């Protein structure tokens, strides 16, 4: 950060001896009441197909509320809220973490049924996102602001894993607050991937940080945070890791296994859909917050160019529907020159048998991965939902994803929303791809397990596409079991019928995901903080090659 410089640390970073960056001092200005104009809102809410009334100004959040107050969402509705709502709020508040008297995040889980804590007593960046959205929707932005500032401090340090120095823009995967009752001090220890199962840096943390910064700005109307030199620099550092020129011939990001929510070896190395969708959303979010002064103008120009290329690439080469599947089935191979139709030399014989039965005549989705001679046909829920929210998916593609969910409800939702991926890996394929991972056995954990946290992303995607009835159906399933099962981390089985064999109870993002989904359904105007409308000026003209087969 400006004026602070970098500090060399070991494999763990600690705040114990470092004076706090007093970023909040520069932010102690009266919040601006901003009348949202069309240019700020990207597109009027009335243009959404949901049929809900337009939410014109910035969502007004009552000031001076304590984080222990009664949820506003309950008071805003004329009907009696589900009993789970109050209990979910109590559980969420129990997970709050304080640093020197200020709330800075929520623990991954508060499971008192086991003595094995592992790393669930830490604040994970990706895990905190639904908690942050719940607090923002409830008019409690302070915890989100403190979290953004605290993680920004951690980004500013020099980071080393063994003898290797990580990029300056890398955000932590998680951090832990250590309380010393004798000295009455609080210290922070951060993990940048050196303590993770696969020792992989979290690629998604920086993207979620930018997306959350925009959500905070949209929810509160407080531009002073995103416009500080520190936040401006933080965004640029994150993007500098992604926009650097190298040997890439694709606009997508090349990633290792285990760098995102799927944090174990699951065959997603290469160009996973989750990272590409988050990358696209982070680019668009940053574009709305970066100031065009100094080097900001150059960064903005690079973002715009990358967005053009990335949207074209993803919409053409990652998209799969019945027609595209038939085209790939008929592909010729070993094509050379720029006129090649099978640009990645995907072998038709590599198409798995299950996808022919899985693909309906109406519907489609973004496949899990596309690279040289490689196409991962698995469905990944997070990547497809974020593609809708970020408008990486065109309106037609967004509707097709929703059609697929309805057609394949039993497979993708079953008895507990939502399958993180489909189908599972099993047998010889499981042994080769996962390395015989005992946690990722068939229909468990990241290998086809069902994750309640994905409910909020599903609900947001449903509202944006005008299909809230799909979300309500999923919420009904959640309300029939989640509280009774003590808010588990994930469910196992082909239908998601069984609590996961290693699932933590009272998993915070399962709790927060439910709250966000309920509040979105109660007040669909909240969608504005986590949704980006299609940018007509950015939208490229998509044309297929003249040699593309006409079937």
From Swiss-Prot:
<keyword id="KW-0539">Nucleus</keyword>
<comment type="subunit">
    <text>Forms homohexamers. Interacts with PIP5K9. Interaction with PIP5K9 represses CINV1 activity. Interacts with GRF1, GRF2, GRF3, GRF4, GRF5, GRF6, GRF7, GRF8 and GRF10; these interactions are dependent of the phosphorylation at Ser-547.</text>
</comment>
<keyword id="KW-0963">Cytoplasm</keyword>
<feature type="modified residue" description="Phosphoserine">
    <location>
        <position position="61"/>
    </location>
</feature>
<keyword id="KW-0007">Acetylation</keyword>
<dbReference type="GO" id="GO:0004564">
    <property type="term" value="F:beta-fructofuranosidase activity"/>
</dbReference>
<keyword id="KW-0378">Hydrolase</keyword>
<dbReference type="GO" id="GO:0034214">
    <property type="term" value="P:protein hexamerization"/>
</dbReference>
<keyword id="KW-0119">Carbohydrate metabolism</keyword>
<dbReference type="GO" id="GO:0048364">
    <property type="term" value="P:root development"/>
</dbReference>
<dbReference type="InterPro" id="IPR012341">
    <property type="entry name" value="6hp_glycosidase-like_sf"/>
</dbReference>
<keyword id="KW-0597">Phosphoprotein</keyword>
<feature type="modified residue" description="Phosphoserine">
    <location>
        <position position="44"/>
    </location>
</feature>
<protein>
    <recommendedName>
        <fullName>Alkaline/neutral invertase CINV1</fullName>
        <ecNumber>3.2.1.26</ecNumber>
    </recommendedName>
</protein>
<dbReference type="GO" id="GO:0005634">
    <property type="term" value="C:nucleus"/>
</dbReference>
<dbReference type="GO" id="GO:0005975">
    <property type="term" value="P:carbohydrate metabolic process"/>
</dbReference>
<feature type="compositionally biased region" description="Basic and acidic residues">
    <location>
        <begin position="53"/>
        <end position="63"/>
    </location>
</feature>
<dbReference type="GO" id="GO:0005987">
    <property type="term" value="P:sucrose catabolic process"/>
</dbReference>
<dbReference type="InterPro" id="IPR008928">
    <property type="entry name" value="6-hairpin_glycosidase_sf"/>
</dbReference>
<dbReference type="Pfam" id="PF12899">
    <property type="entry name" value="Glyco_hydro_100"/>
</dbReference>
<dbReference type="GO" id="GO:0004575">
    <property type="term" value="F:sucrose alpha-glucosidase activity"/>
</dbReference>
<dbReference type="GO" id="GO:0006520">
    <property type="term" value="P:amino acid metabolic process"/>
</dbReference>
<comment type="similarity">
    <text>Belongs to the glycosyl hydrolase 100 family.</text>
</comment>
<feature type="modified residue" description="Phosphoserine">
    <location>
        <position position="547"/>
    </location>
</feature>
<dbReference type="GO" id="GO:0033926">
    <property type="term" value="F:endo-alpha-N-acetylgalactosaminidase activity"/>
</dbReference>
<feature type="modified residue" description="N-acetylmethionine">
    <location>
        <position position="1"/>
    </location>
</feature>
<feature type="modified residue" description="Phosphothreonine">
    <location>
        <position position="70"/>
    </location>
</feature>
<comment type="function">
    <text>Cytosolic invertase that specifically cleaves sucrose into glucose and fructose and is involved in the regulation of multiple tissue development including primary root elongation, root hair growth, leaf and silique development, and floral transition. Is involved in osmotic stress-induced inhibition on lateral root growth by controlling the concentration of hexose in cells. May regulate sugar-mediated root development by controlling sucrose catabolism in root cells. Contributes to carbon partitioning and cellulose biosynthesis in seedlings.</text>
</comment>
<feature type="modified residue" description="Phosphoserine">
    <location>
        <position position="14"/>
    </location>
</feature>
<feature type="modified residue" description="Phosphoserine">
    <location>
        <position position="11"/>
    </location>
</feature>
<dbReference type="GO" id="GO:0005829">
    <property type="term" value="C:cytosol"/>
</dbReference>
<dbReference type="GO" id="GO:0042542">
    <property type="term" value="P:response to hydrogen peroxide"/>
</dbReference>
<keyword id="KW-0326">Glycosidase</keyword>
<dbReference type="GO" id="GO:0016020">
    <property type="term" value="C:membrane"/>
</dbReference>
<feature type="region of interest" description="Disordered">
    <location>
        <begin position="50"/>
        <end position="74"/>
    </location>
</feature>
<dbReference type="InterPro" id="IPR024746">
    <property type="entry name" value="Glyco_hydro_100"/>
</dbReference>
């Amino acid at each position: 950060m400006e004026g602070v410089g970098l500090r060399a640390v070991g494999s763990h970073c600690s705040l114990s001896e470092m004076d706090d960056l007093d970023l909040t001092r520069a932010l102690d200005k009266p919040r601006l009441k901003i009348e949202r104009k069309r240019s700020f809102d990207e597109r009027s809410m009335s243009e959404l197909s949901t049929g809900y009334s337009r939410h014109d100004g910035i969502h007004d959040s009552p000031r001076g509320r304590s984080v222990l107050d009664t949820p506003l969402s309950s008071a805003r509705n004329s009907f009696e809220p589900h009993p789970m709502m109050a209990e979910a709020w109590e559980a969420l508040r129990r997970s709050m973490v304080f640093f020197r008297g200020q709330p800075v995040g929520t623990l991954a889980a508060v499971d008192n049924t086991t003595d094995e804590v592992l790393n669930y007593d830490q604040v994970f960046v990706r895990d905190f996102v639904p908690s942050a959205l719940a607090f923002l929707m409830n008019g409690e932005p302070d915890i989100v602001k403190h979290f953004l500032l605290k993680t920004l401090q951690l980004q500013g340090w020099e980071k080393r894993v063994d003898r290797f120095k990580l990029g300056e823009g890398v955000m932590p995967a998680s951090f832990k607050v250590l309380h010393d009752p004798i000295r009455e001090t609080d210290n922070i220890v951060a993990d940048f991937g050196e303590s993770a199962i696969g020792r992989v840096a979290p690629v998604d943390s920086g993207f979620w940080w930018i997306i959350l910064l925009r959500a905070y700005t949209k929810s509160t109307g407080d531009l002073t945070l995103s416009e500080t030199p520190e936040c401006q620099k933080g965004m640029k550092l994150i993007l500098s890791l992604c926009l650097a020129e190298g040997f890439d011939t694709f606009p997508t990001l090349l990633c290792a296994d285990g760098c995102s929510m799927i944090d174990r070896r699951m065959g997603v190395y290469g160009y996973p859909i989750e990272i590409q969708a988050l990358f696209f959303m982070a680019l668009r979010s940053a574009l709305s917050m970066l100031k065009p002064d100094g080097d900001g103008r150059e960064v903005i120009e690079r973002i715009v160019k990358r967005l053009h290329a990335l949207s074209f690439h993803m919409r053409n080469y990652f998209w799969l529907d019945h027609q595209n599947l038939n085209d790939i089935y008929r592909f010729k191979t070993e094509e050379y020159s720029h006129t090649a139709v099978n640009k990645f030399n995907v072998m038709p014989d590599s198409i798995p048998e299950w996808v022919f039965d899985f693909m309906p005549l109406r519907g489609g989705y973004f496949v899990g991965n596309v690279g040289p001679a490689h196409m991962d046909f698995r469905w990944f829920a997070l990547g497809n939902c974020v593609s809708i929210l970020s408008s990486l998916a065109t309106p037609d593609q967004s509707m097709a994803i929703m059609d697929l969910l309805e057609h394949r409800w039993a497979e993708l939702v079953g008895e507990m929303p939502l399958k993180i991926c489909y189908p599972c890996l099993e047998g010889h394929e499981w042994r080769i791809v996962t390395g015989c991972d005992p946690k990722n056995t068939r229909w468990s954990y990241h290998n086809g397990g069902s994750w309640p946290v994905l409910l909020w992303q599903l609900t947001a995607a449903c509202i944006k596409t005008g299909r809230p009835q799909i979300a309500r159906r999923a919420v009904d399933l959640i309300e029939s079991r989640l509280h009774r099962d003590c808010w588990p981390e994930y469910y196992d089985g082909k239908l998601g019928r069984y609590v996961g064999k290693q699932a933590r109870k009272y998993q915070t993002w399962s709790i927060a995901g439910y709250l966000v989904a309920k509040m979105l359904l109660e007040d669909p105007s909240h969608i504005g903080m986590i949704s980006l409308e299609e940018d007509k000026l950015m939208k490229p003209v998509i044309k297929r090659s003249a040699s593309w087969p006409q079937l």
